[in-house]
Amino acid sequence: LGPFPHTAPRATISEQNPAGTDGFEFVEFAHPEPQVLRDLFSAMGYVHVASHKSKAIELWQQGDISYLINAEPGTHAAEFIDVHGPCAPSMGWRVVDAEHAFKHAVAKGAQPYQGSGKALDVPAIVGIGGSLIYFIDQYFDTSPYNTEFEWITDAHPTGVGFHYLDHLTHNVFKGNMDKWFKFYGDLFNFREIRFFDIQGKHTGLFSRALTSACGRIRIPINEDRGETGQIVNYLKKYNGEGIQHIAVGAHDIYDSVDAISERGVRFMPGPPEAYYKMSHDRVVGHNEPIDRMQKHGILIDGEGVVDGGETKILLQIFSKTVIGPIFFEFIQRKGDDGFGEGNFKALFESIEAEEMARGDYGDQVSAD
């Protein structure tokens, strides 16, 4: 899989990386009630560091993570709210040369965004579900926000210890997973690094995990196995395809999760006690504190301590849905570069149980 997203070397434009991708820059969010987003991001440790000079757009940061809250009327984000409700209307990518990346993508078949409702004055194309992908090349020596935003406080505050965007997952209509794999592959030379076939108690999904040539942009794509599953449920609630969850990396997941829990962030139901009792059999040689894992339901995956003493462990936990059907993942990688595939079934059934408790499946399935 290569380097972790936050430690990969700076990209160059090459045959392997023809668009010159170099990582996530931001995720944009919009909500009919923007204060809901402010309260949520504050609870997660983010700080309002800057505001747009002429638009109702706020920049919230923590570590190397940037979120935009867009409350400006008449924008692409405002139109997105009309269709989807609370939503993630765009993501920004770091690229070596924004104009080059834009022209390359359009030449390969991307739809350029020609509207006047951009969050930032940079090139953009239309992506998943009508969301946008912005191309940003001011990020290495200078902030991309200096031109259009007024700074309120110092950039990149420590917050509660989340420090980079690890991956961002899409949910798509049944039959469209390959279409979107082709989109990312043809335009940006993404490649598949994992394929999953997950079966819960009542529903299932397929997932293709993709990574960019630079190694910093990871996008799993999910589609439902059937007609009544949780991906179908998301698509109904969101009124279309889009971003299912955003995963952020922690320096110390236990301290970070304790902190956001105290601030009111709630998580998906944790696994049964047997999960933790069996964790040493599944993740050999780990010495993670079971009591702290169990406190909030933190999951563990990986090979454990492998030959030669190398550690390959991944720790992860998921918030409840907090922006419409969108949720967040909090992750700490200790030598493991996967997606917690050993936990997929536990997570899947946890989401399924939550949705069944809310009656999201109606009479289509019945509990055991």
Locations of regions flagged by a protein language model:
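An N-terminus-focused feature that recognizes amino-terminal "leader" regions
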Residues: 1-151, 167, 174, 314-316
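C-terminal functional regions that serve as terminal interaction/effector modules
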Residues: 3-9, 18, 245-368
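Active-site-adjacent structural elements in folded domains
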Residues: 10-12, 225-233
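Surface-exposed interaction/gating patches
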Residues: 20-32, 151-218, 227-228, 237-273, ...
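Extended intrinsically disordered, low-complexity coil regions enriched in Ser, Thr, Gly, Ala
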Residues: 31-54, 62-64, 96-115, 176-182, ...
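Flexible loop/turn segments at secondary-structure boundaries
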Residues: 55-58, 76, 142, 200-202, ...
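A generic beta-sheet turn/junction motif
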Residues: 62, 214, 321-323
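Extended catalytic-interface subdomain
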Residues: 86-90, 101-200, 208, 288-331
